[in-house]
């Protein structure tokens, strides 16, 4: 393939499709993590392209915390049904029994039990040897130094000092029993690339990414959208309608909205062209402590 004749987005697309096909050919039991966000939507679109006109040769896995936005759950189920995908949903039963939630137990414990431990449970339960994720290197500093094929030991831990070289687009998927590889086909994409590709390919996304009047309150420097009644207002807090959208999606008590008037994809792209802040500025879990994302990844987080 003549790379010089491909546009920037088509080069990224070709690289990602190559990675997805490589994993499908190399591993015996891969899975695609599906977090319902924009990156997951792009990754799923690329996977469908990679195996068209056939169906996906692996299932989708959603590790559910019980605290995603309602619109995310609706979108997840509708998308899986529309594309004929096998969708696996796992929720940490111990966490559910303990009543773990972000308001009572805080973001760090909630993330560890419901996300990290939940993910490890699901990977062990189904015996997956490779798991696709939609993380990108431009998102956060620990992700910037992670390989496309990210080796995990039998406890699902990541060691940034023990990464494999990836020369000339050759990936080392050699593993022993119990070990696994996390695979990031979107590693070299930026947030702007994602939005331009969504626009180019007309990929459906969760409506929360588009600006609309939504009920929010200010707490701990974050605009929290109130998605259900599982919240106790603190003294002085007032819920008000504001024109907001989300740059990243997660559990609604831990994901801050941004004030915006961007109601269309071209308007979002225009915003991205002048933005000087990270999309993860609204993610509470990234503020738990210095280097919190790397610590989470060392423990088995995606």
UniProtKB/Swiss-Prot annotation:
Pathway note: Sulfur metabolism; hydrogen sulfide biosynthesis; sulfite from sulfate: step 1/3
MF terms (GO), sorted A to Z: ATP binding; sulfate adenylyltransferase (ATP) activity
Record bears the keyword Transcription regulation: no
Ranges in coiled-coil conformation: none
Single GO biological process annotation from the record: sulfate assimilation
Keyword Nucleotidyltransferase (UniProt): yes
EC assignment: 2.7.7.4
InterPro entries per UniProt: PAPS_reduct_dom, Rossmann-like_a/b/a_fold, SO4_adenylTrfase_ssu, Sulfate_adenylyltrnsfr_sub2
Top enzyme category: transferase
Keywords, ordered alphabetically: ATP-binding, Nucleotide-binding, Nucleotidyltransferase, Transferase
Reaction catalyzed: sulfate + ATP + H(+) = adenosine 5'-phosphosulfate + diphosphate
Protein's job: With CysN forms the ATP sulfurylase (ATPS) that catalyzes the adenylation of sulfate producing adenosine 5'-phosphosulfate (APS) and diphosphate, the first enzymatic step in sulfur assimilation pathway. APS synthesis involves the formation of a high-energy phosphoric-sulfuric acid anhydride bond driven by GTP hydrolysis by CysN coupled to ATP hydrolysis by CysD.
Family, per entry: Belongs to the PAPS reductase family. CysD subfamily.
Quaternary data: Heterodimer composed of CysD, the smaller subunit, and CysN.
Protein name (Swiss-Prot/TrEMBL): Sulfate adenylyltransferase subunit 2
Organism: Klebsiella pneumoniae subsp. pneumoniae (strain ATCC 700721 / MGH 78578)
Gene name per UniProt: cysD
């Amino acid at each position: 393939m003549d790379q010089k004749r491909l546009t920037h987005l088509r080069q990224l697309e070709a690289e990602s499709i190559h990675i997805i096909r490589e994993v499908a050919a190399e591993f015996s039991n891969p899975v695609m993590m599906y977090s319902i966000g924009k990156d997951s939507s792009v990754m799923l679109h690329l996977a469908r392209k990679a195996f068209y006109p056939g169906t996906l040769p692996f299932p989708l896995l959603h590790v559910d915390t019980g605290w995603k936005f309602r619109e995310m759950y609706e979108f997840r189920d509708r998308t899986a049904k529309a594309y004929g995908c096998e969708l696996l949903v796992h929720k940490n039963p111990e966490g559910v029994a303990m009543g773990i939630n972000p308001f009572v137990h805080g973001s760090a414990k909630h993330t560890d039990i419901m996300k990290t431990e939940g993910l490890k449970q699901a990977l062990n339960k189904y015996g997956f040897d490779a798991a696709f994720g939609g993380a990108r290197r431009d998102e956060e500093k620990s992700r910037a130094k992670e390989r496309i094929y990210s080796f995990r030991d039998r406890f699902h831990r990541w060691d940034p000092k023990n990464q494999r070289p990836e020369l000339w687009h050759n990936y080392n998927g050699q593993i022993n029993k119990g070990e696994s590889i996390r695979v990031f086909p979107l590693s070299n994409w930026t947030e702007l690339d994602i939005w331009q590709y969504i626009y180019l390919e007309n990929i459906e996304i969760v409506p929360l990414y588009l600006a609309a009047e939504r009920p929010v309150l200010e707490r701990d420097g974050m605009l929290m959208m109130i998605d259900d009644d599982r919240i106790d207002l603190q003294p002085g807090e007032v819920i008000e309608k504001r024109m907001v959208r989300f740059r990243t999606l997660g559990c609604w008590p831990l994901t801050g909205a941004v004030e915006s008037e961007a109601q269309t994809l071209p308007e979002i792209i225009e915003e991205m062209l002048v933005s000087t802040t990270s999309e993860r500025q609204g993610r509470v879990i990234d503020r738990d402590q210095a280097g919190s994302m790397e610590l989470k990844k060392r423990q088995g987080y995606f």
